[in-house]
UniProtKB/Swiss-Prot annotation:
InterPro entries: DHS-like_NAD/FAD-binding_dom, HACL1-like, THDP-binding, Thiamin_PyroP_enz_cen_dom, Thiamin_PyroP_enz_TPP-bd_dom, TPP_enzyme_TPP-bd
Name of the protein in its database record: 2-hydroxyacyl-CoA lyase
Organism of derivation: Schizosaccharomyces pombe (strain 972 / ATCC 24843)
One Pfam family recorded for the sequence: TPP_enzyme_M
Name of the encoding gene: hac1
Binding site residues for Mg(2+): 447, 474
Catalytic reaction equation(s): an (R)-2-hydroxy-long-chain-fatty acyl-CoA = a long-chain fatty aldehyde + formyl-CoA; a 2-hydroxy-3-methyl fatty acyl-CoA = a 2-methyl-branched fatty aldehyde + formyl-CoA
Cofactors (names): Mg(2+); thiamine diphosphate
Family to which this protein belongs: Belongs to the TPP enzyme family.
Length: 568
């Protein structure tokens, strides 16, 4: 009995319990993609390899199993490299499969020839070409396992065209067992004792919850820890939702005060990178001590972190063990400390200020538009008992959405991540529709960010996915121009580098692909469109025109300076 190579690849993925594969067909992988689909695995064909690879990385994050992406060789691999980089920097598991030139045509100028194993090796955990067609089973299974073991990342398997055209006689006829999830590493007891000592002696402790804790599914342990100890917490943008945003110990509204005053900081799957200003003054206290919990050893001790207080282990296991050591200690339950009073006063002041700024106007202000989006959709979510998974992308839109869009459940928000990568939005949304199929997937993007992957609207519509896409349209990158200024400056060839076309009808692109589009300029139409789109079980796009903010100074919460420095 023989089997085609493509069928063997599909069987291997099926044995691994892969449910969905993202990619783009082409020579020579079209036969593999068709075999995958024939096996019962869902194949989602994209319009661009970048988006397909981004989708696979997000699926890996949401499921804690490698997302699988199939692309053609040469330029297809180069395009998919964006997803490989995304996987590496965010530490999400990805299995990339790609076609390649025939082995006997190597170095002959073959069709789309590229030494893909060498090209990808520096950026992956494993990059292999099976030594023979029958060895593809071992290669894929090994790559799948390595991708999610230890620090998650990308593994690559090269599939030469002459392999794809071959048949295999010697292969495992019975289903192979699935690969179990990655084993979890327990913390060093000595490091735990140190961490417990510092926490118990802290005057101003702070728990920082990162997306590493979200990937570790540590929400139960974190909630128990916070509610018992009374330590205030601050979630990273993708750590939001692990703990209730309405929790009285959530100090997101007093972020600057929390960073400036904390003396002992417990980092649960969060990195001291640009998102948290490296742990350095003036954003942080110069005397702050950082207790790091991370599964990536190379991260430990970075920037202001102290390697002596580092814990190389699973976040959930570590918090559970640490909780047992501090069970007899409480920081603030039932009491008020000067540190907590400062945080509460700052939070109340900032929340009052935010409330006062919520005023309807024409044109709509971006902050108010986002406030309306959150208020309306949270109400609809509550009535329908259906969670929202947010996908947020853009500069201003993402930065402000971090504060204004409420996340109600773990892993309920995806954004541009560690590298602040633009173009991930639609790929992430499509992945979320498969990983969180019971949720309403809501994509909130700036108009410039949406342009990176707008044609994936057709992918979502073709696959009959339930997505609500909201484009916050200010006619530009960061900020834009009104129509009069745009036309005057364009005629003189003096358009600012940040300017995009005015009032572009992104809603009509959605309608042209078979979806539902809404074009809104005021609060009443925005609320009405949100209600209609919520009831739609296919793809809807609401194009929200907001103030271009041409005169607004560029500032972001993560910037160490209020001035945008030029790239050298």
């Amino acid at each position: 009995m023989s089997i085609s190579f493509s069928e063997l690849v599909a069987k291997t993925l099926l044995d691994l319990e892969v449910k969905v594969v993202f990619g783009i067909v082409g020579i020579p992988v079209i036969e593999i993609c068709e075999a995958i689909q024939a096996s019962g695995i869902r194949f989602v064909g994209f319009r661009n390899e970048q988006s397909a690879a981004y989708a696979a990385t997000a699926y890996g994050y949401l499921t804690q199993r490698p997302g699988v992406c199939v692309v053609v060789g040469g330029p297809g691999v180069v395009h998919a490299m964006a997803g490989v980089f995304n996987s590496k920097t965010n530490r999400w598991p990805l299995l990339l499969l790609a076609g390649s030139s025939e082995t006997f045509q190597q170095n002959c100028g073959a069709f789309q020839e590229l030494d893909q194993v060498s090209y990808l090796s520096p950026h992956t955990k494993l990059a292999v070409r099976p030594p023979s067609p029958k060895m593809v089973v071992d290669s894929i299974r090994r790559a799948y396992r390595v991708s999610m073991t230890g620090t998650p990342g990308t593994c690559y398997v090269d599939l030469p065209a002459n392999y794809i055209e071959s048949t295999v006689d010697d292969f495992p006829k019975d289903p192979l067992p699935p690969i179990p999830s990655s084993p979890k590493c327990a913390p060093d007891p000595t490091q735990l004792q140190k961490a417990a000592y510092y926490l118990k002696n802290a005057k101003a402790p702070l728990l920082v919850v990162g997306k590493g804790a979200a990937y570790a599914c540590a929400e139960k342990q974190l909630l128990e820890f916070v509610e018992h100890t009374g330590i205030p917490f601050l979630p990273s943008p993708m750590g939001k939702g692990l703990l209730p945003e309405s929790h009285p110990l959530n100090v997101s509204s007093a972020r600057s005060a929390a960073l400036r005053n904390a003396d002992v900081v417990l980092l649960a799957g969060a990195r001291l990178n640009w998102i948290f200003q490296y742990g350095l003054p003036p954003k942080w206290s110069p005397n702050a001590k950082f207790i790091q919990i991370d599964t990536n050893a190379e991260t430990l001790g970075n920037n202001a972190a102290d390697l002596d207080l580092a814990i190389w282990a699973d976040v959930g296991l570590t918090i559970d063990c640490l909780f047992k050591l501090v069970q007899t200690w409480k920081y603030s339950v039932g009491i008020s400390t000067p540190y907590l009073r400062t945080l509460n006063e700052t939070r109340s002041k900032n929340e009052k200020k935010a409330l006062e700024s919520r005023k309807s106007s024409i044109p709509l202000q971006m902050n108010y538009a986002l406030y309306v989006v959150n208020e309306e959709l949270q109400s609809l979510s509550l009535k329908s008992k259906r969670n929202i998974t947010w996908v947020s992308e853009g500069a201003n839109t993402m930065d402000r959405g971090r504060q204004l869009l409420e996340v109600t459940h773990p892993r309920g928000r995806l954004d541009a991540g560690t590298m602040s990568t633009m173009g991930v939005g639609m790929g992430y949304a499509i992945a979320s529709a498969f990983a969180h199929s019971s949720d309403k997937i809501v994509v909130v993007e700036g108009d410039s960010a949406f342009g990176f992957s707008a044609m994936e609207l057709e992918t979502a519509i073709r696959n009959q996915l339930d997505l609500l896409v909201i484009v916050i349209n200010n006619n530009g990158v960061y900020h834009g121009l009104d129509t009069d200024a745009y036309e005057t400056l364009r005629d003189n060839h003096q358009l600012p580098t940040t300017a995009l076309g005015t009032s572009i009808r992104y809603d009509q692109i959605c309608e042209a692909c078979g979806g539902k589009g809404f074009f809104v300029k005021n609060e009443e139409d925005l609320r009405s469109s949100l209600r209609k789109a919520w009831q739609t079980s296919s793809v809807s796009l609401i194009n929200v025109m907001v103030d271009p903010e041409a005169a607004r100074k560029l500032t972001f919460a993560w910037m160490s300076s209020t001035k945008v420095k030029p790239k050298l």
